[in-house]
From Swiss-Prot:
GO terms assigned for molecular function: GTP binding; GTPase activity; translation initiation factor activity
Coarse class of the protein's main subcellular location: cytoplasm
Lineage, opening ranks: Bacteria, Pseudomonadati, Campylobacterota, Epsilonproteobacteria, Campylobacterales
Gene that encodes the chain: infB
Protein name: Translation initiation factor IF-2
Region (G1): 452-459
Pfam families: EF-G_D2 (PF22042), GTP_EFTU (PF00009), IF-2 (PF11987), IF2_N (PF04760)
Amino acid sequence: MSGMVDLKEFLAELGKTQKELKNVIEQAKDIGLELKTNSKMTPEQAGKLYKYIVDGIKEQIQANQPAKNPEQDNKDDLNMVQTPKPLNKKVSKTPKKEETKSQPKPKKTKEKKKEAPTPIAKKKGGIEIVNTFENQTPPTENTPKVVSHSQIEKAKQKLQEIQKSREALNKLTQSNANNASNTNNAKKEISEVKKQEQEIKRHENIKRRTGFRVIKRNDETENESENSVTESKKPTQSVAAIFEDIKKEWQEKDKQEAKKAKKPSKPKATPTAKNNKSHKIDFSDARDFKGNDIYDDETDEILLFDLHEQDNLNKEEEEKEIRQNINDRVRVQRKNPWMNESGIKRQSKKKRAFRNDNSQKVIQSTIAIPEEVRVYEFAQKANLNLADVIKTLFNLGLMVTKNDFLDKDSIEILAEEFHLEISVQNTLEEFEVEEVLEGVKKERPPVVTIMGHVDHGKTSLLDKIRDKRVAHTEAGGITQHIGAYMVEKNDKWVSFIDTPGHEAFSQMRNRGAQVTDIAVIVIAADDGVKQQTIEALEHAKAANVPVIFAMNKMDKPNVNPDKLKAECAELGYNPVDWGGEHEFIPVSAKTGDGIDNLLETILIQADIMELKAIEEGSARAVVLEGSVEKGRGAVATVIVQSGTLSVGDSFFAETAFGKVRTMTDDQGKSIQNLKPSMVALITGLSEVPPAGSVLIGVENDSIARLQAQKRATYLRQKALSKSTKVSFDELSEMVANKELKNIPVVIKADTQGSLEAIKNSLLELNNEEVAIQVIHSGVGGITENDLSLVSSSDHAVILGFNIRPTGNVKNKAKEYNVSIKTYTVIYALIEEMRSLLLGLMSPIIEEEHTGQAEVRETFNIPKVGTIAGCVVSDGVIARGIKARLIRDGVVVHTGEILSLKRFKDDVKEVSKGYECGIMLDNYNEIKVGDVFETYKEIHKKRTL
């Protein structure tokens, strides 16, 4: 090993990088050592610099020129020590080594164990002695080491102990001739020690050097017969350690020989054996590392030593002291010789297991997802791979992208496929502005919704209660809008909501049931329970509200209220007088009989329910209806559920927002404040809000605008997502039905509720052959923009409900050849669109069997064809009718009868039991035994 220490190697041993080289050079200057990037140091300089960097012990280095090369440095050291050149040639590492070089012989395993200390260089007079190369000059890289006089005294004591062990060994040698060579080796080692002792005395006045040593792993066993280059790299060891190792080795051998006769035992592991697997760089120091070579032969870790005299400390104390000395300046690495990381191997296993856990996604068993969620959001919440989710939907016949929304059915299917338990949450809850209203709850009026079948007298009954005649103002005498009114009875107010009874207004009835406290089901006593009656009862049951039955038209003759009660009892609504829970009040909207009894029953039910609400704070209301009025813009009918809505308040309702400009009650009077359960018509909206949306009051316009924009963005993305979803079945239908007939329509209505009802009714008319395509719908009048949307379509039509186009729009419609149709009754609109669809649909073709004939003989006539001689077995065979030729129960040809003859005469038809001759059009492959089956096609119109 070279006597010079390269700066880069020094940095590597410290665990520092090249980036920290500058700091090391600066620290070297502090102790008087000038270094450069490629400089080398003597072991003494390296030792002092190490103590300064790690321990903070500052020892000044005498000013001298740093060695430019290892050869010059070694020459200076040799001149200082005045060591004779023959010394290195004469003294080798061990006597065994010298003997091996002079006479190479194969060595036994025992000899290798006995010569375990031989790879360690001996110190003679404080100088490291390293084997020389054969036929070469003495190595110049050996740096002389000088030790103190105290070490010489210790060496003498060790020598005496070795002398005693030698005497014991001689006795063993007599009993066992095989150990003679070991004794000779011991004698040679002792002679070498004496020579080293003399050398120590010569140089005892030379200043002792300090240094450091690093223990490294040497996994392969050193062989004494290796070449000199390998031997020159063998580690050195202190004199005291060498003597201690020799003593322990021979003592162990004495014990083994003594026990050999009794019981063979396995030799114990000794520190010497450990030294066989270590590589030591020793710069002589006063420190004694006898018992501190803590090295585990079975681990790959590199151990860092404290460089101080160590007591018998446990591993935890050693690690704590090491961390404190290093002070977080040494990087911890797997093979770093400066850190004792005894648990690295075990920790690496944990890391590998941790990586394996991360590579596999854990599928959750229960997840909470919103009601409408995108594909990638579902994958994230369920901790699934997005590709697996899309692949599963693809295999189920649904092509989606990661941004598409999943409907409830798709979510349930995915939950089954991935074995998940889901809890669906309301999507719009994240958009809700939660505000805790503080205050005292006060009594509020009940909200009563009147529902029932069409033409059962709901609006007429409400008109009688209000002393108004609203039914006469409705087109066709049927209610087509949802209305809200306030009625006072016995100094108490009751809010009534009138819902349409037509089947098209199912969603209106549902909204009315959602905001109501009490449901009044109006049933005509002369008509009984009908379809919309059952639907209204289902809405009330879903809303969990009490139901009161009003048996209307009791003034008519031949009414049967008991029959009506029986029909309701079959549905689960038993009358009170039959032992049930539901009140059946007989009333007459024409005469007014039973009205007071109905109102009193409603108030009693409200008292039982103890309806209360907080009046202070921001308002929360429900939009019952929205429309556009000339001169007022977008307006909405709202009913307040909590808080107070005042003129000037900012609000938002779905995508609409604004500030309350005016409020008008059902009597047309202007009001300033709207308290719970009160209804009014408000203005000041940015657009018509959807019917059934929640209106929420906020602090200012900016908050209202922001909330409305959030909802608009969400609804837009949702609509785009739904438009991109196409199933395989739908694609195949579109390809197969290239002649699918679509009727593009634009629908404009006066109110949002009516518009919604018309759209739903028209979409129900669609079938596999023709369909109505709503390309635009809105509240308000017909504009030129509506005309431009349908101008390029052949069958396009614009439908207006309760609105009239202006003269300019009519002229543009003629120019674009666009049909505009307006209606005031929803019945007429739906029936006309049904007729239009039927006209575009192909008729239904049915077959009618007319006759059957059996072939008895065939005649081939040149230039004419084959004529079949037949007997009519059933019905009548006519000329020009379609016929099937059946052979052995299989239809082989279908065509028309070209010629029909009886004998030589042409006839129009032949009846059952008669013979005839039949010739088919362009077919001559007729055989005896074939059967003719004739039929005619009947075209029938389709119905919707």
